[in-house]
Amino acid sequence: MTLAMAEQIATADNPAFVVVSDAAGRMRIQIEWVRSNPRRAVTVEEAIAKCNGVRVVHAYPRTGSVVVWYSPRCCDRQSILAAISGAAHVAAELIPTRAPHSSDIRNIEVLRMAIGAAALTLLGVRRYVFARPLLLPTTSRLVASGVTIFTGYPFLRGALRFGKTGTDALVSVATIASLILRENVVALAVLWLLNIGEYLQDLTLRRTRRAISALLSGTQDTAWIRLTDGPQAGTEIQVPIGTVQIGDEVVVHEHVAIPVDGEVIDGEAVVNQSAITGENLPVSVMAGSHVHAGSVVVRGRLMVRASAVGKHTTIGRIVTRVEEAQHDRAPIQTVGENFSRCFVPTSFVVSAITLAITKDVRRTMTVLLIACPCAVGLATPTAISAAIGNGARRGILIKGGSHLEQAGRVDAILFDKTGTLTVGRPVVTNIVAMHKDWSPEQVLAYAASSEIHSRHPLAEAVIRSTEERHISIPPHEECEVLVGLGMRTWADGRTLLLGSPSLLCAEKVKVSKTASEWVDKLRHQTETPLLFAVDGTLVGLISLRDEVRPEAAEVLTKLRASGVRRIVMLTGDHPDIAKAVATELGIDEWRAEVMPEDKLKVVRDLQNEGYVVGMVGDGVNDAPALAAADIGIAMGLAGTDVAVETADVALANDDLNRLLDVRDLGGRAVEVIRENYGMSIAVNAAGLFIGAGGALSPVLAAVLHNASSVAVVANSSRLIRYRLD
């Protein structure tokens, strides 16, 4: 299909679309059947996103417009148009339940920021390029005032709606006072910074809700169920995920997410349950085992009788917990808000008294000018912006100023084990030859040959080990997967077995006393043993372990030295493994075999005891605890989307040492903010009464007012250059 053909289609009675523009990797398409239909907008986004080379796609149901950003080198534009045609015929019940991506962008907010930036730029050019006076002429002042009112409208509306002397009233008073005294530049600068902060905070919340919604619906829009009655009993049919009911027999194929909680009634499989337990190593399940929605069948096929569906599944409860925890988070009462509650009404009273007693309008204007809390409004956002920029350069992504404040106060930290205190991917620790004709290198080489086509993490670890040792992997003729046990391979005319001790027992391979002692020893050390047999004879053993991060012990020691009183390790692993890891790291408190609800309970319990709690994790199962903690920290942007979106801080480079930097930066940011408030409040408070006494002229008041703002910005800028130890 060419662009010309697409334009011809638009003239037909079929679902129409017109390519409005297509240049420089950006295509805009007008689709009439998307207009006023958010669900169809989602369909188009889903269809186009599957095309190779497409980077971002936004569908706007208000206008019927779709904007696609793509790579001109990698993307076939005809496939985009074909995807749109196909999206027109998707059944309504198969459309994912979510909002269009364009809902993350509110044009009016972007417009306010853009107009504010443009106005500040023009005022700067006027003052410093054309050397014009500070005071604006009438026409320019009217335009600037209009821009100020437009950019400050949300705050003005909030102050009028709630009628309280909070943040909105603080900003509104500053805006009105600045307009009266012709301080348009100050008003615009403050409003522009605050608009950016409000926009980013709102955007983060919307993205979090979208990530959580995607988690609940999963990647599966449909499920296969087996009919149990009627003339078609035994037939497997595909149905929308929303129509699956409790008691249905759900068929789950390889590499597909399990859509329901339930009991396995037929089949065997290796299942990755990391979305629930947080543990990367898959487990074997068979008839009688209980499985959870969100788990993925790595290998095999299962028949599951549904016991919970939708929001009532374990993964659904995780979503609910996250949403509740986010809503329960108490708002932090900043110094600026507390100051405004007292100072703003006081300034009005003092100015009114001054006017009543002196009848001097200029003195009253001086009081309002010196009382204008613009410097107080700048105290936090400038420091936070500098600190966040400093952290970003070091791979610390902080989502808001309140989280910086909490980072410096944390005195209890919870760690998820897998992927946080440990590396999160198993490595080979021992290779033992148990036959005189076999060397450890041969054992590893042929073991890798057996695992070469497997996607199991243990298999990947064995193969990585051969690459690290530069050992060639011999070919094999045929292989067979023994679900839950291991692999059977035929190579060089011999039969190779690699797997658990249970596999060798089932195949009647004799396991020597030495090998049994090795197995017991390794399990006690939290390592996984794989036995290797050739033609019915045990010839070697390989053990694997999820290694503790090399920096973990030192980081924990430094955290204790910095004032952290409680460190607790949480894991879904067996108690023996948890105990061994905790002992190695010197952790006295740990919880094993915990579910997401249990992690959340530990957070709540510590908070009830009076601790400021930090939670460090990287998985979906950590999300409720990350949201409920006073500060949630996601380890690595490679972690799950929900963990990263829910957390208050994300560590991009996956290094535990960054935890120390978060704490250090948070403490330093709080110090700077306090200094800013001290300076600005002192100037406002002293200036209020000095101005009322007539010791200041409006010009001096304006100079003092601007000087306090400059001092606050200069003090905050020190955070940009602050060096973390």
Curated annotation (Swiss-Prot):
SUPFAM superfamilies: Calcium ATPase, transduction domain A (SSF81653), Calcium ATPase, transmembrane domain M (SSF81665), HAD-like (SSF56784). It is found in: Cell membrane. The active site is at 416 (4-aspartylphosphate intermediate). Mg(2+) binds at residues 416, 418, 618. One of its GO terms (molecular function) is copper ion binding. The chain crosses the membrane at residues 101-119, 142-160, 165-179, 188-202, 335-359, 365-383, 669-688, 698-717. It catalyses: Mn(2+)(in) + ATP + H2O = Mn(2+)(out) + ADP + phosphate + H(+). The keyword Cell membrane applies. Its EC number is 7.2.2.22. InterPro entries: ATPase_P-typ_cyto_dom_N (IPR023299), ATPase_P-typ_P_site (IPR018303), ATPase_P-typ_TM_dom_sf (IPR023298), ATPase_P-typ_transduc_dom_A_sf (IPR008250), HAD-like_sf (IPR036412), HAD_sf (IPR023214), HMA_dom (IPR006121), P-typ_ATPase_IB (IPR027256). One of its GO terms (biological process) is copper ion homeostasis. Keywords: ATP-binding, Cell membrane, Magnesium, Manganese, Membrane, Metal-binding, Nucleotide-binding, Phosphoprotein, Translocase, Transmembrane, Transmembrane helix. Its main location: membrane. Residues 25-92 form the HMA domain. GO terms for cellular component: plasma membrane. It is a multi-pass membrane protein. High affinity, slow turnover Mn(2+) transporting ATPase. Belongs to the cation transport ATPase (P-type) (TC 3.A.3) family. Type IB subfamily. This is Manganese-exporting P-type ATPase. The gene is ctpC.
